[in-house]
């Protein structure tokens, strides 16, 4: 009987991708299969996120909840991977001595060896090093799960914003070779994938080596080549940094219709004083200039962003500037949070005296404004025909289908389940608070 693996994933899309790769590695080496039930698992892995303190503490809480399973099954392997593992290393074993393996984002491919080392030596195995591109070279082929797939094209971050722990937990920016990415995309397309999402902490900083030349490919060139892969109908990329938005990338929105009309471009704040304290490397005017260029290239582009509320020293005036930026840009959605101090980051040394209730009130105001804007944008889509990738059944009604539009909206509609993992045309009939409703359009050629 094959061994079973349970994985709990915290955090970003990169972590979701990494969790899939953990499963692929263990399946290829030992025939391990996934389970949704930790109580029947032979291996339990936590793929962690350290961007915010709450997510970090949740990991140790969840570790405590599976400790009893170790007593019931002494052969159970418990592992901690991801950014908390990279940050804490051996300290995880000190705090939770029943953990067997600790590995970082760049060493997940070594999982089989780490598990074998744990069993051979009788003590926890820890590897949180940064072996750059080795991880990708050691990966087995991906398991194809549908018509949409993530493709990691680079790792790490070299920006060192004062609030962010990612450069310390994932290392500096490292890009995969250009041809390696194209080969993976072509393989995915050959197995029925029609939509790819290119992943990286700063994905638009991609600079991949090209065979036969000393030149490096940027994200714009990579997208142009991916668009030529037979079977690929839609291309996304995330997450971007404003400092890496180039004219060649703006031009790609004109040249490549398969590149979606949606971009997640974190701004974090609308005050130049706060942006400087964060060391983001741009001003609000420069950010708005980027938005103007994007909309000149793709007028209907939908924009989402990240916001940190209550950064040390943020005044009421600073926050009002953020609200003005939200109005000026017309963001479609956001990931917005109250500032969470991270150990080892420069912002930890800044005065953080803003009362918690003030921070909470600011966050609620910001989220309400963006929700209002999102609903207004959704309303303008009513009556339009949207190309939708059918992802599965609706979360609220299993008798309906749910899919995603080019501009990243969820649409629920009636249809045959055989349409799952295909593209269909849907007329939007109504707009709800967070989703759209529609009906399939049969085109007459």
From Swiss-Prot:
It is found in: Cytoplasm. The keyword Cytoplasm applies. Gene3D superfamilies: Methylthiotransferase, N-terminal domain, tm_1862 like domain. The keyword Secreted does not apply. Binds 2 [4Fe-4S] clusters. One cluster is coordinated with 3 cysteines and an exchangeable S-adenosyl-L-methionine. It catalyses: N(6)-dimethylallyladenosine(37) in tRNA + (sulfur carrier)-SH + AH2 + 2 S-adenosyl-L-methionine = 2-methylsulfanyl-N(6)-dimethylallyladenosine(37) in tRNA + (sulfur carrier)-H + 5'-deoxyadenosine + L-methionine + A + S-adenosyl-L-homocysteine + 2 H(+). GO terms for cellular component: cytosol. [4Fe-4S] cluster 2 binds at residues 157, 161, 164. Residues 3-120 form the MTTase N-terminal domain. Catalyzes the methylthiolation of N6-(dimethylallyl)adenosine (i(6)A), leading to the formation of 2-methylthio-N6-(dimethylallyl)adenosine (ms(2)i(6)A) at position 37 in tRNAs that read codons beginning with uridine. PANTHER family: CDK5 REGULATORY SUBUNIT-ASSOCIATED PROTEIN 1 (PTHR43020), MITOCHONDRIAL TRNA METHYLTHIOTRANSFERASE CDK5RAP1 (PTHR43020:SF2). Belongs to the methylthiotransferase family. MiaB subfamily. This is tRNA-2-methylthio-N(6)-dimethylallyladenosine synthase. It comes from Dechloromonas aromatica (strain RCB).
